[in-house]
Amino acid sequence: MSFNALKEKGIPFDKQLRTWHDIVKRPYNRVEVDCYTRTRQILMNGIETEAWNFKHHFGRTCDDLELVKKIAQIRKIENTQQNTVNWLAPACQTILDTTLGYEQVAVDLTAWLAQNEPDNYVRETFNFGLLEDFDHLYRYSQWAYLTEGKNPNDILQHQTDVIIGRPTQNHHNCNAIRIRKHYDKTKTSPQTKVNILTLLSGEQQTHNYYAEHGFMYGNDDLRRTYAEICDVEEEHVTMYESLIDPTETMLEKWVLHEFTEVCTYYNCYKDEVDEKIKQVWEEFLAMEIEHLKIAAEFFEKHEKRDAEELIGTEILLPCHFESQKNYVANILETEIDKRQDGTEEMGYTTIDKLPPDWASYKVQQTVGENGAPTEQTIINICATLGRDIVSADKKLVQKQAALLAKGLEPEAQAPNTVTVKDYENMPDNSNFEELF
């Protein structure tokens, strides 16, 4: 069905204020909820937070009073939208439960976007980040058992594999190396622009969640694990935002933000299986259609251009959630040794081709001098169970040692690194579900 967001009818802006009872709705059931309902809720929380952040920055840098007032009015509505979406999570869902949900978003969303990204360089960047978030899911899954005695599939529902990725201790870089070549706003498709904003919003929300909640556990190793992975999420935000053309005007950015909200809410509405939450996506889609129209009016007034030049006439689907096991496994086996080269080309290389003075070596050696928390995670689970918790096809599990041998940098290993030999010596754990 054709859906031109600028031509659709939404909720009039003067009808968008809601009561507190409507803003704070009943949360979903932690036990019964579909895992991808949870991922949609997590992502849309990030989408709304990015919209709120952007409009505050816009308001601080704009001297057009009419525009600043309208931005402030829309921002108030979007703040309440964020409240609604965030409050859909139940109080009985622990921080680690939610963390597994965040990493499921990161893995399955990034894989979806990579497969639906027309720009080869942007797709390569998505795949690069994918293998890092995949390893984060593996590390946090150990803590779900160590801290709360939980099976990670209570949250993941067997839709996303749990197995080693590119080792987290090797994710720490000179942040300048993370900067990527930006797209040309005059040549790049709306699909690429929306894809980047969608993933950027999710990664930014992940960083913020870990920064604001990781300290709330008492176990020092777990607290440090949150700190370590939070640092990587900062690098991911840096990496993805650098893909955006810095010459975009603030009005162009505003239109793109509103269009991204329309697309993501539309996608959530089309896919949602929970009827009560589907109503939330439908209502907020109708609100965002009007926000987009307002942004388009200001864009056309000030820049004398039609907003369709930016966003086209078709809706996009940037956040369809489904199992991505086969795609992720293929990227894992072929790209686990990939690294950012640190050259003016802002490209990629492999571990064996890194120069001795690669800037990220010093960063990794410094932060890992006393050990890497994410390596201690595996030491702790092995001390408890004799090996790590994994959930994947047995053939893939049997490749863990080989994957580590390919993906672990020999030059910057923390003193507590779990070695390839350690993985080779781990007993079979294909029946780990029997623990629960």
Q: Can you say where each PLM-predicted feature lies in the sequence?
A:
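Non-heme di-metal
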Residues: 1-436
